[in-house]
Swiss-Prot record:
Record note on disruption phenotype: Mutants are viable and females are fully fertile. Males show premature mitochondrial aggregation and fusion in spermatocytes and spermatids, leading to an aberrant mitochondrial shell around premeiotic nuclei. Improper mitochondrial localization occurs in the testis associated with defective central astral spindles and a lack of contractile rings which leads to meiotic cytokinesis failure.
Chain residue ranges for the region called Disordered: 167-193, 389-414, 485-512
Comp. bias intervals (Basic and acidic residues): 167-176
Composition skew (Low complexity), residue ranges: 177-191
Polar residues composition bias: residue spans: 393-414, 485-503
Function text: Required for male meiotic cytokinesis through its involvement in the regulation of mitochondrial aggregation and fusion, astral spindle assembly and contractile ring formation.
Top-rank taxon, per record: Eukaryota
Annotated organism of origin: Drosophila melanogaster
Alphabetized UniProt keyword annotations: Cell cycle, Cell division, Differentiation, Meiosis, Spermatogenesis
The UniProt record lists the keyword Translocase: no
Lineage: Eukaryota, Metazoa, Ecdysozoa, Arthropoda, Hexapoda
GO biological process: cell differentiation; cell division; meiotic cell cycle; spermatogenesis
Gene (UniProt): mtsh
Protein name: Protein mitoshell
Length: 649
């Protein structure tokens, strides 16, 4: 038996940790991912051999092909006696992982693409079906590596590991070779969002919870950008194009920091506020896109210089934002249409069954317009609008008249169709679009809402007919006209029992005075000048409006809110000439001081005491300067019912 026997010293050998890496590039939906690796892990084990043991080598070991069987040749090569030839266990497992899992496992288990390309290793080729038999040796296992669960792939959009079955199901999905450009943009958006769109289709909007971290990140970045923009706007404030930009940045910062006011506005204004908000957001988003696309899509040399100064990756970020904007704009348009349909249902329940067919036809026309907008071109949309089949203006009175005429078989003329009706036609649309702080809104049958505040209650028609009694006035006038011939009888008949018409007459002195007289003009001028001086006062912000007073001093407001009027109301009365004399305006200014002093006699509030001293000092300084005389108004203390005029006429 020609088997060579070699004597080797006692050694402790450990199997080599053989790793084979190769890079695989695959297409994850629409993204090119180059971070997938397949590793061959060989189980680590160590064994100890007895001293002066013989190593039997049946022949030279020839490494076979990675994809073929091992074959031995008849030629026996000479083996160097200084080297011990061995073959470790061919146990191997295949792993595929994304960049996230590689970084989690560490550099000992995973290698990046660049490192594997630059570092050279020895990569022996093995095949598990070789016929070599391990010599029978006495060994003991010292350490074994616990193999982890094999992971096949990872979705880079959601960082969720996918099993083999999910990969097969994804591979079986039909992928159209040619799609419409609009659909391709949406598909790329869905692929970039990972499994978010598939989950969203199964859940309602109220059941989807977004990450709070994104909210904090956007707020942090926006605040930082607002500060930088405000500094730049202040630096360039003398340029005409920077007019009011600093105010816009400051208001944006306030909007980011103050609490969300959507729920209070919905509670006070109703669903119309939500419709207005979505229309407002739609216009702002599209306006932002209009500004940016002027810089992106134009290619003159001057704009190219500007685009080169933009940060690297701006064009790619704009393109991805443009794709997502296309989707969100469509969603917003459908959102305020759906909200308007909900508003129409509430109006139908408010107005009764008569207005239901009209509102239903308007909502159907809106829905058909959106569907035609998704499927047809611009020519069809303009054709539908010019022929009268386009969208209606959200159930305006003009559309109700038009629908009633169509139901009766009467076709309105073109002049009647396109003739503007001013505020009558656009009242409801303006109610949704304009801000509630800028427009006075009243309740009517169209479903408009009241702005938050205090208003006179609406009176029914029957009450309005009963309040002005016309017959007693006529009888009173006729009887006085008949008794003019007897002047001696006028004195005993003066206190007539029917004196109710006298109480209904207005008690305002302005109705009995001539506003164009010299006295009336002088009083009006003094009140206007006094209101301007009050506006220039300092330390009156906390009493400028009762809402501010309630925020700063809630206990004082709770006890004394009905005992004084705020500074804003005093200024408005001066501008409207509601005061008969300037003394009344001064009395109301000092009425605030008197009310606070009375409150501080019973309660303790150091902040209120300090601020009322500042307020009183400002008022006294104003009243002691020209055109007023010193100590001219010291007799006016602000007490209820005090005598304002210290002289007799």
């Amino acid at each position: 038996m020609n088997i060579p026997i070699y004597q080797v010293p006692s050694v402790t050998m450990q199997s080599l940790h053989q790793q084979s890496l190769y890079q695989q590039t695959y297409l994850d939906r629409n993204r090119m991912v180059t971070d997938v690796f397949v590793q061959e892990h060989v189980s680590q084990s160590s064994w100890s051999m007895a001293g002066s043991s013989a190593v039997f080598i049946p022949g030279p070991i020839i490494t076979g092909s990675a994809h073929g069987h091992c074959h031995h040749t008849a030629t026996v090569s000479t083996v160097s006696p200084q080297l011990a030839t061995f073959m470790p266990f061919p146990g191997m497992q295949y792993y595929a992982a994304s960049s996230a899992t590689m970084n989690a496992y560490g550099h000992n288990q995973m290698y990046s693409t660049r490192a594997s390309a630059s570092v050279g290793f020895y990569l022996p080729q093995y095949h598990a079906s070789c016929s070599h038999e391990q010599p029978k040796k006495t060994f003991c296992a010292a350490q074994t590596q616990t193999q982890q669960t094999a992971k096949t792939s990872c979705d880079v959009g959601t960082q969720v590991d996918l099993d083999a079955e999910e990969l097969r199901s994804e591979a079986r999905k039909p992928r159209p070779e040619s799609v419409v450009p609009e659909e391709s943009s949406i598909s790329s958006l869905e692929s970039g969002a990972g499994d978010g769109f598939r989950v969203q289709k199964k859940l309602r909007n109220s059941e989807v919870k977004l990450l709070d971290q994104r909210l904090h990140d956007i707020t942090r970045v926006s605040l930082h950008g607002s500060e930088i923009a405000e500094r730049l706007a202040n630096a360039h404030r003398n340029r005409p194009c920077f007019k009011k930009i600093d105010t816009l940045c400051a208001r944006l910062k306030q909007d980011l920091l103050r609490p969300d006011g959507v729920l209070p506005n919905i509670n006070s204004q109703g669903i119309a506020w939500a419709v207005k908000d979505f229309i407002f957001v739609f216009t702002r988003i599209v306006n932002a896109w209009v500004i940016l696309k002027g810089y992106v899509y134009n290619t003159p040399d001057a704009l190219n210089k500007i685009k080169d100064e933009l940060p690297s990756g701006f064009m790619a970020s704009f393109d991805s934002w443009q794709i997502s904007t296309l989707s969100i704009v469509k969603m917003i348009v459908k959102s305020f249409v759906n909200l308007d349909e909900l508003l129409q249902k509430q109006k139908n329940s408010f107005s009764g069954k008569d207005g239901a067919p009209i509102n239903q036809s308007n909502s159907i026309s809106l829905r058909s317009f959106i569907d035609s907008n998704d499927s047809s071109g611009l020519a069809q949309k303009y054709l539908g609008m010019t022929t009268g089949h386009g969208p209606s203006a959200f159930s305006t009175p003009n559309n109700q008249i038009r629908n009633n005429a169509a139901s009766k078989g009467q076709e309105p003329t073109s002049s009647a169709l396109y003739k503007p009706k001013c505020a009558l036609n656009l009242n409801y649309l303006y109610t949704m679009i304009e801000d509630s702080e800028e427009t006075q809104r009243h309740v009517d049958a169209n479903g408009t809402y009241l702005k938050t505040g205090t208003y006179q209650p609406l009176q029914k028609e029957s009450m309005q007919l009963e309040m002005p009694p016309a017959k007693p006035n006529d009888h009173y006038v006729e009887r006085n006209a008949n008794q003019q011939a007897l002047p001696s009888q006028e004195i005993p008949n003066a206190p007539t029992p029917k004196s109710s018409p006298q109480s209904d007459r207005p008690r305002d002195v302005r109705s009995y005075t001539n506003p164009f007289s010299a006295i009336g003009k002088e009083v009006t001028r003094q009140l206007y000048e006094f209101s301007d001086r009050v506006m220039e006062l300092k330390n009156l912000e906390r009493f400028f409006k009762k809402q501010f007073t309630r925020n700063y001093y809630p206990n004082f407001y709770q006890h004394c809110q009905d005992d004084f009027i705020d500074v804003r109301a005093i200024i408005l009365r001066c501008e409207n000439s509601s005061y008969h004399h300037i003394y009344q305006a001064i009395h109301d200014l000092r009425r605030i001081i008197f009310t606070v002093r009375c409150y501080l006699q019973m309660y303790t509030d150091e902040n209120l005491l300090y601020y009322i001293d500042l307020y009183e000092r400002s008022v006294n300084d104003m009243l002691s300067k020209p055109p007023h005389y010193p100590n001219q108004f010291d007799h006016i203390m602000g007490r209820p019912g005090e005598k304002l005029f210290n002289y007799e006429i």
